C-alpha cells in the first residue's frame, strides 16, 4: 500500500519548526551544491529564517556578482514587458532600492563574517573563501605597515645624517676659532717679550757740559746762592735772638 500524501502546513510547535528548518535547510544547501557541480550551473540560494537570520549558498566566490547579474537580467526583461515610461521609472526606482538594500545587507553580513560572527551557517567552501580573503587582506595590511615603517626609518636616518653633518661643521668652526685665538695669544706674548728685551736709552752727557753744570757760577746757581743767603740770615737772626740778653747784661756790667 502506497504512502499517502502529507499535507503541507505551518508547524505550530516552535521547537519542531526549528528542527525541521535546520534539517531542510541543510538538505536544500546540499542539493544546490550538487546541481552546481553536476550540471556546471551557477546556483545561488538565499534563505531567511523566521527570526530574520540569513543563510545563503553561491557557486561563485562572491554573491554580489550573481545578484548584479540577476538585476541586469530582470531589468532588461521588465523594460520589454512594461512600455509605459512612468511605470518604467517607478520600476527602476524600486529595482534600484532593492538592489542597494540587498547590497547593504550583504556588506553588513560580510562585515560580521570578517569579525568572526555568524559563522555557523557557512559551509566549508565558504569558510575557506573567507579565510583566503582574510589572509589576502592581512598581506596587504602587513605590506602597507612595512612600507610605512621603512619610510619612517629612512626619514630618521636622513635626519640623523643631517644632524651629524651639522655637528661636524660646528666642531670644525669651533676648532678654527680656537686656533685663531691661540695664534693671537702667541703673537701677543712674543711681542711682550721683544719689548722687554729692548735696552732702555741712556741720557747723553757731554764732558764739557757736565763740568760747566757743576761749576759754582752765581749766574748758573742763583737758586743755590739765594738759599745760602737765606740760611745765613736765619742763623744770624737766631743768634741775635739768643745772645741779646747777654749783650744787655754785659753792657750794664760795663757801665
Curated annotation (Swiss-Prot):
Domain K-box, first and last residues per copy: 90-180
Record localization: Nucleus
Tissues/organs with expression: Expressed in young flower primordia.
Protein's name in the database: Transcription factor CAULIFLOWER
Annotated phenotype, changing residue 196 to N: In strain: cv. Kent
GO biological process per UniProt: cell differentiation; floral meristem determinacy; positive regulation of flower development; positive regulation of transcription by RNA polymerase II
Record-linked SMART domains: MADS
SUPFAM superfamilies, sorted: SRF-like
Keywords of this entry: Activator, Coiled coil, Developmental protein, Differentiation, DNA-binding, Flowering, Nucleus, Transcription, Transcription regulation
Origin species: Arabidopsis thaliana
Result, substituting residue 39 to Y: In cal-2; no visible phenotype. 'Cauliflower' shape
Function, in words: Probable transcription factor that promotes early floral meristem identity in synergy with APETALA1, FRUITFULL and LEAFY. Is required subsequently for the transition of an inflorescence meristem into a floral meristem. Seems to be partially redundant to the function of APETALA1. Positively regulates the APETALA1 and LEAFY expression.
Gene that this polypeptide is encoded by: CAL
Assigned GO CC terms: nucleus
One MF term in the entry's GO annotations: DNA-binding transcription factor activity
Subunit relationships: Homodimer capable of binding to CArG-box sequences.
InterPro entries in the record: MADS-box/MEF2_TF (IPR050142), MEF2-like_N (IPR033896), TF_Kbox (IPR002487), TF_MADSbox (IPR002100), TF_MADSbox_sf (IPR036879)
Residue ranges that the Swiss-Prot or TrEMBL entry lists as coiled coil: 90-198
Principal cellular location given in the protein's record: nucleus
Reported impact of residue 131 to K: In cal-4; no visible phenotype. 'Cauliflower' shape
Amino acid at each position: 500500500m502506497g504512502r499517502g500524501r502529507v499535507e503541507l502546513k505551518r508547524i505550530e510547535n516552535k521547537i519542531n519548526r526549528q528542527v525541521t528548518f535546520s534539517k531542510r535547510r541543510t538538505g536544500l544547501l546540499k542539493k544546490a551544491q550538487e546541481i552546481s557541480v553536476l550540471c556546471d550551473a551557477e546556483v545561488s540560494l538565499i534563505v531567511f529564517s523566521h527570526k530574520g537570520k540569513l543563510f545563503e549558498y553561491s557557486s561563485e566566490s562572491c554573491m554580489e556578482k550573481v545578484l548584479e547579474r540577476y538585476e541586469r537580467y530582470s531589468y532588461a526583461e521588465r523594460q520589454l514587458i512594461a512600455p509605459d515610461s512612468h511605470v518604467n521609472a517607478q520600476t527602476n526606482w524600486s529595482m534600484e532600492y532593492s538592489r542597494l538594500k540587498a547590497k547593504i545587507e550583504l556588506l553588513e553580513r560580510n562585515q560580521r563574517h570578517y569579525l568572526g560572527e555568524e559563522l555557523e551557517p557557512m559551509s566549508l567552501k565558504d569558510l575557506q573563501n573567507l579565510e583566503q580573503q582574510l589572509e589576502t587582506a592581512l598581506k596587504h595590511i602587513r605590506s602597507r605597515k612595512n612600507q610605512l615603517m621603512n619610510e619612517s626609518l629612512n626619514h630618521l636616518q636622513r635626519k640623523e645624517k643631517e644632524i651629524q653633518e651639522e655637528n661636524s661643521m660646528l666642531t670644525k668652526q669651533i676648532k678654527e676659532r680656537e686656533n685663531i685665538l691661540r695664534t693671537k695669544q702667541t703673537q701677543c706674548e712674543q711681542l711682550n717679550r721683544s719689548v722687554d728685551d729692548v735696552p732702555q736709552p741712556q741720557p747723553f752727557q757731554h764732558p764739557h757740559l757736565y763740568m760747566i753744570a757743576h761749576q759754582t757760577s752765581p749766574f748758573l746757581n742763583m737758586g743755590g746762592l739765594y738759599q745760602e743767603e737765606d740760611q745765613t740770615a736765619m742763623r744770624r737772626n737766631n743768634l741775635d735772638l739768643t745772645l741779646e740778653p747777654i749783650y744787655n747784661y754785659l753792657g750794664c756790667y760795663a757801665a
